[in-house]
Amino acid sequence: MFSKDGLNNLMQHAQKIQEQMKKIQQEVSEIEVTGESGAGAVKVTLIGSHYCKKIELDKNTILEHDKEILEDLITAAFNDAVRKISDLQKQKMSSISSEMKFSNNLNLPF
């Protein structure tokens, strides 16, 4: 059976983690990242919620590349930006993941 103090500590700990996760989610949603391809010829800027804010094309790229290559470059830049957001989310969430491992000082029977 849980002790009253142990259960209270567990609930406080869970609430603290939940608040930290909300804060991190808010921070990540406001982050801007730019993915690039073709040595910077194509740039895609996303915000943390994976919303595409801007696509930039180097004017020389438009003139030199055909439609299919340009589409591939845009796709690669977009995927690069999505990967960067994912990496940032993992990095920020790892800061609280260790707190999710409950320590012995919670007075829990397990």
Swiss-Prot record:
One cellular component (GO) term of this entry: bacterial nucleoid
Domain of life of the native organism: Bacteria
UniProt cross-references to PANTHER family, sorted A to Z: NUCLEOID-ASSOCIATED PROTEIN YBAB
Subunit structure: Homodimer.
Protein name: Nucleoid-associated protein bbp_426
Lineage: Bacteria, Pseudomonadati, Pseudomonadota, Gammaproteobacteria, Enterobacterales
Family to which this protein belongs: Belongs to the YbaB/EbfC family.
One of the record's GO molecular function terms: DNA binding
Function: Binds to DNA and alters its conformation. May be involved in regulation of gene expression, nucleoid organization and DNA protection.
Entries under Gene3D superfamilies matching the protein: Nucleoid-associated protein YbaB-like domain
